[in-house]
Amino acid sequence: MWLSKKAVNLSEETKTDSMKAKIDCFIPWQSDEQVATTLQQLRQDANVEEIHFLKEDGPGNTQTLQWIAQRAQADYVLLYTKYDTLQLGYHALTRLLTIAQDSDSLMLYADHYIVTPDGTRSPMPLIDCQLGSVRDDFQLGSVLLLRTSVLREYIAQENLHSYHYAALYDLRLFISRRCLPLHVDEFLYTEVEQDTRLSGQKQFDYVDPRNRSRQLEMERACTRHLRAINAYLHGDEYDEVKLHNCIQSLFLSYHSLYP
């Protein structure tokens, strides 16, 4: 089986009140040593009810999301998308859970810190998700909090497509048609960043022939979303615009914390 069926049921010693446990956590697994520190943090958090390990296929695979939806029993699902150790901030899960309940949001993501292989720790402030935020590489970070009910609704779709790479992206677009993912502007965790390339290099990964299969899936998911919101425009469905005699230059100013 491509998914580990191993789950950690928290003991009474680590759960102060089982009635208050409202999060099931799903983290990628490669070895017991790799998940040890992350597992220890989660087991000590009273908000956590169960911890499940994902093996081999990640949340980009539709079957993985189906597996998660079948096993999640708590009100919310915490999805961690990296193999590196997750370092949660002080009461991070409490903050996420409180904001989720107060705002009635379906999906939340938060600002965080990143640590590069050389040990440098830097803040990673994110931006709010807008209706037009349809890029598959829109930065959400590696920690996502989802309402379990909306994940089950997504899986229960009659026209659910089977993806190898684009399932989590498709889920985000599905949720955005109901309620935009909520940006929590608090630095709630620290993640390790192994890809230290400049942002100008990363943004062209989609044209790399090695990523062709992945990119085609992302395009299909995006096209389905645009059709669902009546925003899809076929290439031959518009009138040709006459050229004007004047030329205008447009300058955009921006501020970036990173090169």
Q: Where do the model's predicted regions map?
A:
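C-terminal, non-catalytic tails of nucleotide-sugar-dependent glycosyltransferases
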Residues: M1-S18, F204-Y258
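Short, acidic, metal-binding catalytic loop of nucleotide-sugar glycosyltransferases
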Residues: K15-M19, T38-I51
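Glycine-rich, basic loop-to-helix element that forms the pyrophosphate-binding segment
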Residues: G58-A72
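Short beta-strand-to-loop acidic/aromatic patch adjacent to the donor-nucleotide binding site
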Residues: A74-Q87
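Conserved donor NDP-sugar-binding/catalytic core segment of glycosyltransferases
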Residues: T85, Y90-P123
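A recurrent flexible, glycine/aromatic-enriched loop bordering the glycosyltransferase active site
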Residues: R121-L146, V150
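A short, conserved alpha-helix in the catalytic core of glycosyltransferases
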Residues: V150, H161-F187, V192, C222
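Active-site donor/metal-binding and catalytic loop motifs
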Residues: D185-D208, V241-H244
